[in-house]
Design a protein with these regions (language model features):
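Nucleotide-activated donor-binding/catalytic signature segment of Leloir-type glycosyltransferases, i.e.
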Residues: 251-278
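Conserved donor-binding/catalytic core segment of Leloir-type glycosyltransferases
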Residues: 156, 201-228, 241, 361
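A short, well-ordered alpha-helix in the C-terminal region of glycosyltransferases
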Residues: 349, 356-370
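N-terminal subdomain of nucleotide-sugar transferases
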Residues: 1-47, 231
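Conserved acidic donor-binding segment of nucleotide-sugar-dependent glycosyltransferases
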Residues: 329-340, 349-355
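Nucleotide-sugar-dependent
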Residues: 10, 219, 275-280, 287-307, ...
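Carbohydrate-associated surface elements
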Residues: 161, 182
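Membrane-proximal helix-turn-helix segments that form the acceptor-binding/catalytic region
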Residues: 79, 101, 105-109, 121, ...
Length: 389
């Protein structure tokens, strides 16, 4: 297996590894080194090789340079190891898509190749670099995507929206399996919403709205803060709690809260481990996913959505394709992506109608139960087994 990310911190490769090891696989893993973990180690029976490269943080040139070094390194390692023992399978995680190059020698010697496309690179590039679909780099990403998919025996992706995109421009739909990023049931135990929620909310000390995740512009913390400023006019006890690693964008948003006079109602509480997030979600009244609308968020199905629902909490999410493929207005509170006024309206509805949103959360849990990790893991193992057989 190869991934341009750190192990065991990137959850999707980690859980794929756990699933395959549980099914009896022996795994050699090539991944990024974070400067702290050893370059080589045997961890839980997995042979781990870490390449000492930092994840790129700047422009396209740095991305291309670091990707190139990593692809060359992993390709050479897999080629040399293939001389000593033949691989049955090479499992490649994007980004980049052309990391599949590292599997060329094992494939020539008979190995099957699985390409796990976490994100469509053209859409992500459009979002990160604010370029149009006709941009030359975006067109190149589409060509590389098609070329990379052609090298794979099986493509795995994260939701129906991504499957539609890949099948529309790169391969037949039958080649693509959907394995969603569902919460770990061992960490996020299933909890039902209150059975007898009141029809109306009595005055409370506070009404806690929660945001957790990456604090970048596309994820819409600014939308949540603008909405909170409106909500405070009729729900004075409303409070927004923010969790995630600090960023310059967060600092800018805290200044915005200060300028709006709601700084005491926007609490930044830092990053949390998954186990700690369970406790924090348990303390909130409502989760929000306040995304802006762009090429990437339009097709994204946030794992955070399922994390709230697993713990019985109502959640407001944008009415984008990656979400409406699975949920309708009976099972989720929707707002128009990027629209702070609409988000404020839905938060107010949630506050004043506790019984109704409890029922909506309950129906949302029915959707979540169709996509628990136990089910998604089984899909993964069945499709990989089908390729090998």
């Amino acid at each position: 297996m190869v991934t341009f990310s750190s192990y065991p911190f990137d959850p999707r490769p980690r859980r794929a590894i756990d699933a395959l090891v549980g099914a009896g696989a022996t795994i050699d893993l090539i991944c990024l080194g974070d400067g702290k973990a050893p370059k080589r180690e045997v961890r839980n029976g997995i042979n781990v090789l870490r390449v000492p490269l930092k994840h790129p943080r700047r422009g396209k040139v740095e991305y291309a340079f670091r990707y190139g070094i990593f692809i060359l390194t992993s390709g050479v390692v897999f080629a040399l190891r293939s001389l000593l023992r033949r691989y049955d399978l090479v499992y490649v995680h994007n980004m980049p898509d052309i990391l599949v190059l590292s599997a060329l020698i094992p494939k020539a010697l008979g190995a099957k190749v699985v390409l796990d496309l976490h994100d469509p690179m053209p859409e992500l590039m459009r979002t990160i670099f604010h370029v149009s679909e006709d941009n030359r780099s975006v067109r190149l990403m589409k060509e590389l995507e098609k070329w990379s998919i052609a090298r794979a025996d099986l493509v795995i992706t994260v939701n129906l929206a991504c499957r539609r995109i890949f099948s529309s421009r790169s391969c037949e739909v039958e080649k693509i399996a959907v394995v969603m990023n569902a919460p770990d049931g061992q960490i996020f135990p299933f909890r039902t919403p209150p059975a007898n929620a009141p029809a109306n909310r009595v005055d409370t000390e506070r009404f806690v709205i929660m945001y957790h995740g990456s604090l970048v512009e596309r994820n819409g913390l600014d939308v949540a803060i603008d909405a909170l400023a409106t909500v405070k006019e009729c729900v004075p006890c409303a409070e927004l709690r923010v969790f995630g690693p600090s960023t310059p964008f967060l600092e800018k948003m805290m200044e915005t809260a200060l300028n709006k006079g709601i700084q005491d109602s926007v609490r930044y509480l830092g990053p949390r481990k998954l186990e700690e997030l369970v406790t924090e979600i348990g303390k909130c009244d409502l989760g929000v996913i306040p995304n802006h609308r762009n090429a990437f968020t339009d097709i994204n199905t946030p794992t955070r959505l399922f994390e709230y629902l697993a713990l019985g909490k109502p959640v407001i999410a944008p009415s984008t394709l990656g979400i409406t493929d699975y949920f309708n207005r009976d099972s989720l509170l929707f707002f128009e992506a990027g629209n702070a006024t609409d988000l404020a309206r839905q938060i107010e509805f949630a506050y004043f109608h506790p019984r109704e949103i409890s029922e909506i959360a309950r129906r949302g849990q029915d959707v979540y139960r169709e996509h628990t990790w136990d089910r998604e893991r089984q899909t993964l193992l069945e499709r990989v087994s089908g390729v090998l057989n």
